[in-house]
């Protein structure tokens, strides 16, 4: 089976990055990227929600609720019929370390979609009452992920299927994004949405990224179709999506979140809406709950900028795993997890990284200085907790 190695492919686009960053990535957009680093898995069967609820960090129960219970109105061209937005979640080891991340989607059922005229509900033919969910997952660990899920399945009535050939993952991001929460079935008779839904019983549409508004829109679409609005946007390589995430300090997949090692709270999974503290037990829940209620997360994933002594950006290749130290003393402050050109991100000691007097550098490359960047989306208490030692994670 074809496998896309994102670590290897990213190295090809360093030149693209150099040109992009100096033209102002923060002002670029809108852009759309097909995410070759991601794949799609389908879950179906009466035990789908129960099965995932016992495994994942987020509360999956809302996918089992009938949309009719929430909204009894007949869908109209001015009323979106899709009521379940996507969800971000993770599967952990029993010790509470990161294994895999998931973007979960609930497709529109046929009776929840408008007909082709946009004037009424579609046919409910083929509905068998079972729950169906799709997951956008890391392609590099797909086979391992499927084996792990099937190991946990036991007697659960849930089918787990690789549908990578049928569907692709996409992201829309950057500045000046046009509204797209109503694109597709149930969001009005939009010709771009119709062209994508045509011949596709699922009627996929764009959704706001469940992690952060600044990340844009995300969804999965049939592999043989162009998603709505992509033709109007600039379709660009996935490396630019990595750059966008580096700007905001958001990691994704096992290439950036070390499998079996990373502590989800240090990778800001609470702020990324990936963890529910009200759902009850799941695999690895004990460590997450204990760490959260202890109150202080001293290390977090932080955006980094690599510069010289004059503050000029350095487009040098910084390897993942490189240590960031305090200049002069050599005290370790953190570790680079991902880097491309002059930008990166790493798990750092928050208090030390953001000290005004902090002088950081890459270990054994003292000419490469490191600047920690405060993400605009971070809640104020994340900065305060390391000063007071009492704020919640």
From Swiss-Prot:
Q: What is its main location?
A: mitochondrion
Q: Where in the cell is it found?
A: Mitochondrion
What is the extent of the transit peptide? 1-70
Question: What tissues has this protein been observed in?
Answer: Expressed in flowers, siliques and seeds (at protein level).
**Keywords, in A-Z order:** Mitochondrion, Transferase, Transit peptide
**InterPro entries reported for this sequence:** TrmE/GcvT_dom1, YgfZ/GcvT, YgfZ/GcvT_CS
| Superkingdom field | Eukaryota
Q: Which Gene Ontology molecular function entries are recorded, alphabetically?
A: transferase activity
Report, from the record, the phenotype seen after gene disruption. Answer: Embryonic lethality when homozygous.
- Which top EC class is given? transferase
- What EC numbers are recorded for this enzyme? 2.1.-.-
Q: Name one GO cellular component term.
A: cytosol
| Recorded family membership | Belongs to the GcvT family.
What task does this protein carry out? Folate-dependent protein involved in Fe/S cluster biogenesis. Functionally complements an E.coli mutant defective in ygfZ.
- Identify this protein by name: Putative transferase At4g12130, mitochondrial
Q: Which organism is it from?
A: Arabidopsis thaliana (Mouse-ear cress)
